[in-house]
Amino acid sequence: MKLSLLSTFAAVIIGALALPQGPGGGGSVTCPGGQSTSNSQCCVWFDVLDDLQTNFYQGSKCESPVRKILRIVFHDAIGFSPALTAAGQFGGGGADGSIIAHSNIELAFPANGGLTDTIEALRAVGINHGVSFGDLIQFATAVGMSNCPGSPRLEFLTGRSNSSQPSPPSLIPGPGNIVTAILDRMGDAGFSPDEVVDLLAAHSLASQEGLNSAIFRSPLDSTPQVFDTQFYIETLLKGTTQPGPSLGFAEELSPFPGEFRMRSDALLARDSRTACRWQSMTSSNEVMGQRYRAAMAKMSVLGFDRNALTDCSDVIPSAVSNNAAPVIPGGLTVDDIEVSCPSEPFPEIATASGPLPSLAPAP
């Protein structure tokens, strides 16, 4: 993932943690395909689901297309700035699908490099099924994550208009930004420092493609096909290794061969404003999933009134559970952790047996 870094908030939390049934379970409407759902407006999404899983995700795999959609969902939604609006300028439409509708403009933004093929594939799906691009991006994200063990089941609301304007430039925080710049940009969009850390759980499934081409698709943690806390643990390990022949853009030393470390991740893990939240994400896959789901529910309605949208979460499949406990990778110990939260002791996390890992590129 060449990243950029993706009603009341209480209502968002409640909605985000109430797991829906599904896919197609427990509803009162029977769709033409025989599926059961809560609302007739949701029926079209079963057809989109089959199309995405068969073609876009190449048989429901947790591979590169999932990582691309995680970039896209964040880059689309974060094009939202109340500060610009207050200054009398267009502040962006948020999660409106403008990255697809206005790809001729938005794909020229440096943060969106390498997304053209994925955007065009999504455009074809949206047109074929007659769904809005904003809805499609949110749906494809939830479906894609369901292919990755351990992922939370994301909320999916439909009803976004397909009318949008191009996002203003320079609204996507990037891996070379300092922490203050990231927190200021995310704060403008309505996210607290804690929520910034929560959203970075997406990096559990991430790899980089454009930051260091010599180590193409090098993962950001040792389990890039599993949604787990290893990303938070491993980003706190001392950087000792240069995984490629030279360091790439916004790259820091890594704890073992094959793993890529983004400068923004390393800084956020150690900054006084975010370090304690970061540390709290290391020891519980369940807590990480709950927090990510809540933050994604909030991001998915940037620019929209959630009460005007229809809940079709029951169409989203559930991911396979991940029962593996968090570990400090083999060859390392807790002494290799750069503890950065002064107010709380580092959690007790087991150390894996075996030698220091050496990671292959993510698929």
UniProtKB/Swiss-Prot annotation:
EC number of the protein = 1.11.1.7
Q: What is its main location?
A: secreted
- Pyrrolidone carboxylic acid carried by residues: Q21
Gene Ontology molecular function terms on file: heme binding; lactoperoxidase activity; metal ion binding
> Which InterPro entries does the record cross-reference, listed alphabetically?
Ccp1-like, Haem_peroxidase, Haem_peroxidase_sf, Ligninase, Ligninase_C, Peroxidases_AS, Peroxidases_heam-ligand_BS
Residues that bind heme b, according to the entry? H203
Query: Does this entry carry the keyword Nucleotide-binding?
Result: no
Which GO BP terms sit in this record? cellular response to oxidative stress; hydrogen peroxide catabolic process; response to reactive oxygen species
Gene for this protein?
CIP1
Sorted UniProt keywords: Calcium, Disulfide bond, Glycoprotein, Heme, Hydrogen peroxide, Iron, Metal-binding, Oxidoreductase, Peroxidase, Pyrrolidone carboxylic acid, Secreted, Signal
PROSITE patterns tied to this protein: PEROXIDASE_1, PEROXIDASE_2, PEROXIDASE_4
Q: Which family does it belong to?
A: Belongs to the peroxidase family. Ligninase subfamily.
Q: Where is the signal peptide?
A: 1-20
Which cysteines bridge via disulfide bonds?
Answer: C31-C43, C42-C312, C62-C148, C276-C341
**Site entry (Transition state stabilizer), positions:** R71
* Protein name, entry field: Peroxidase
> What does the record note about the cofactor?
Binds 2 calcium ions per subunit.
Q: Which reaction does it catalyse?
A: 2 a phenolic donor + H2O2 = 2 a phenolic radical donor + 2 H2O
- Enzyme class, spelled out: oxidoreductase
User: Where would I find glycosylation on this chain?
Assistant: N162, S358
**GO cellular component terms, A-Z:** extracellular region
Q: Does the keyword Transcription apply?
A: no
The record's subcellular location field reads:
Secreted
Positions binding Ca(2+) 1 in this chain are D76, G94, D96, S98
